[in-house]
Amino acid sequence: MIALRAPTPLIDRLPAVRGRLSADVALAPVTWFRVGGPAEAMFKPADAQDLADFLAGRPRDVAVRVIGVASNLLVRDGGVPGVVIRLGRAFTGVEVVGETLVCGASALDATVAKVAEAAGLAGLEFLSGIPGTLGGALRMNAGAHLREMADIVVLATAVDGLGQSHTLTPAQMGFSYRACALPEDWIFTGCVLAGRPDERGAIAARMEALRQAREASQPLRARTGGSTFANPDPDLSGGRRAWELIDAAGCRGLRLGGAQVSEKHCNFLINTGEATAADLEALGETVRRRVMDTSGVALRWEIKRIGIGLDGLSAGENG
């Protein structure tokens, strides 16, 4: 009889690193929704070179995902096969250089806005209301209040899936509405952002006005993943934004299991306490169907969905 050899654990197939490499890491505690299964492995690189060396040396059949603070992310209940990369302290720097800010990709958007305010640099106030890190903001061309990352990026640095480092102009990043054109396996490591001189008091006043507007209109203290769907092309939606289409479809307050469409802002899904990732995703798909039925508009997920369901299957991550 031929003895069957057990498969080699993923962690033992990965290259040596200077950062932290761990197996079977719970992801639910780090996501804003507080749902989802574990990462098969997680890598926290010591610095950009450690990240590049890991990507260059990993087996080509091992999938890689990067997450920040998981504020706009839904991890499915079966977890994430392969390696989840989470940039840490080495990527959190924010330095003012003239009228620019040199930032690591793991710096919080809100922190960058505060540093800009303290330096008397305007134009970055909108970042104060965007949850998450700059890496995620670059990846999705995050924006609010008629401003977006494409308006302030001078250049960015990234490492591709083969471990090669790149310095990119905005044109090379191919920004569009809530998207950039870089391949999914490229990982942003930093960027340079442009501001313009202004009075600190005026900047602070604008940021406070934005904070008050968010408090009044969004469920900031709920377990939520931020805006669920991107606003559709105005030419296709008659100028209506995603929340207006959702409201018109009768979905405000709609529930499925432990998931609910927010009563306060119906482009937000909420974990009421006992939701699974499957509840949240199914509710989102129900909303999409109802909007299509009532308005003919196909809403596109803005929340990134990763991993596999408990049935071992993975649904689409976009659309």
Curated annotation (Swiss-Prot):
Q: Is this entry keyworded NADP?
A: yes
In this chain the FAD-binding PCMH-type domain maps to 35-198
Q: Name one Pfam family in it.
A: FAD_binding_4
Catalysis performed (reactions): UDP-N-acetyl-alpha-D-muramate + NADP(+) = UDP-N-acetyl-3-O-(1-carboxyvinyl)-alpha-D-glucosamine + NADPH + H(+)
Q: Does the keyword Cytoplasm apply?
A: yes
Please report which protein family the annotation says this sequence is part of.
Belongs to the MurB family.
The molecule here is called UDP-N-acetylenolpyruvoylglucosamine reductase
Please tell me the species this chain comes from. Rhodospirillum rubrum (strain ATCC 11170 / ATH 1.1.1 / DSM 467 / LMG 4362 / NCIMB 8255 / S1)
